[in-house]
UniProtKB/Swiss-Prot annotation:
The keyword Thylakoid does not apply. Pfam families: LCM. This is Putative S-adenosyl-L-methionine-dependent methyltransferase MMAR_2791. NCBIfam families: mthyl_TIGR00027 (TIGR00027). The lineage of its organism: Bacteria, Bacillati, Actinomycetota, Actinomycetes, Mycobacteriales. One of its GO terms (molecular function) is methyltransferase activity. One of its GO terms (biological process) is methylation. S-adenosyl-L-methionine binds at residues 129, 158-159. It is an enzyme of class 2 (transferase). The keyword Flavoprotein does not apply. It comes from Mycobacterium marinum (strain ATCC BAA-535 / M). Keywords: Methyltransferase, S-adenosyl-L-methionine, Transferase. Belongs to the UPF0677 family. Its EC number is 2.1.1.-.
Length: 303
């Protein structure tokens, strides 16, 4: 399969693994994290991301790591996903510092925070994803002798099924505060699926719980992205993936949904605002990309 085939049209009951369909986006993002890590100023170094790329055998991503891009345009997506990674890293650090002992990573993919971050003693990280994705991640990291820095409990479940029951079985305590990340997932959900996901999370959250959600491309116009690439010959920003074919539009804004149910929502930020907060000056390509992708990052607390 070529990278251009990964952006095939979705169906509501489609299936995937780490090298196909929506699952490939997790591998692609891991590749961008790996590229940002070897860049000049990584915001959230992920030394483990390269292991997933090597194990996948994906020709495109392995070639990228063997010959890392260097121009400000070519490194746009690695840089922007570095910003996104830092946002969610900081969210979990803040929650842990406040005493939250349960972290839930929804659609965990190749997220390595259970292994990367310094978690306080007694913290449990619950990773929700398909069994084949979780198995791939654990197998690759075990092969390299990497151990989690918190209790890591796998929640092997499809989000379209009764995953809260599986989460309970994995030891989750709904009576205790928890911190939830929904990173990069919402564009791939239908409106009904997004509402159902947030309703279930709301039901599982005790007072004092927190949620962070966001995506670099909350809405994405693939044709505009292609047009931007054409103005920079030789630059492949998207990895040949048609994200528009994998995503759904016309959904309730997450900040509005959470606020309507009593959550206290912090000011919503986009990628450019995050970059500025991290002491960066967004280059022109980042400004153009954000106009195309409409990034937004949200943190909310349940009173």
């Amino acid at each position: 399969m070529t990278t251009s085939e990964y952006g095939s049209r979705r169906s509501d009951d489609d299936q995937w693994d780490i090298v196909s369909g929506v699952g490939y986006t997790a591998l692609l993002v891991a590749g961008w994290r790996a590229l940002d890590t070897v860049g000049p100023q990584p915001l959230a170094p992920d030394e483990y991301a390269k292991y997933f790329i090597a194990a996948s055998g994906d020709a495109y991503l392995n070639d990228q790591l063997a010959h890392p891009p260097t121009s400000v345009d070519e490194t746009a997506f690695p840089r922007l996903y570095g910003v996104q990674t830092r946002f969610f890293d900081d969210f979990f650090r803040s929650a842990a510092a406040a005493g939250t002992k349960q972290a839930v990573i929804v659609a965990a993919g190749l997220d390595s925070r259970a292994y990367r971050l310094e978690w306080p003693s007694g913290t449990t990280v619950f990773e929700i994803d398909l069994p084949q994705v979780l198995e791939f991640k654990a197998r690759v990291l075990q092969r390299h002798g990497v151990e989690p820095k918190a209790r890591r409990n796998e929640v092997a479940a499809d989000l379209r099924t009764d995953w809260p029951a599986t989460l309970h079985a994995a030891g989750f305590e709904p009576g205790q505060p928890s911190a939830w990340s929904v990173e990069g997932l919402l564009p791939y959900l239908t409106a009904d699926a997004q509402d159902a996901l947030f309703a279930r999370i709301d039901d599982l959250c005790a007072p004092g719980s927190r949620i962070a959600t966001g995506a670099l491309g909350s809405r994405l116009d693939h044709d505009q992205l292609v047009a931007l690439e054409q103005t920079h010959p030789g630059v492949n920003l998207s990895g040949d993936v048609n994200f528009s074919a994998l995503t759904y539009d016309d959904k309730t804004n997450p900040a509005q949904w959470l606020a309507a149910r009593g959550w206290v929502v912090e000011p919503v930020r986009n990628t450019l605002e995050l970059e500025a907060g991290y002491g960066m000056t967004p280059p022109a390509v980042d400004v153009r990309l954000d106009a195309i992708m409409h990034s937004e990052y949200i943190v909310a607390t349940k009173p």
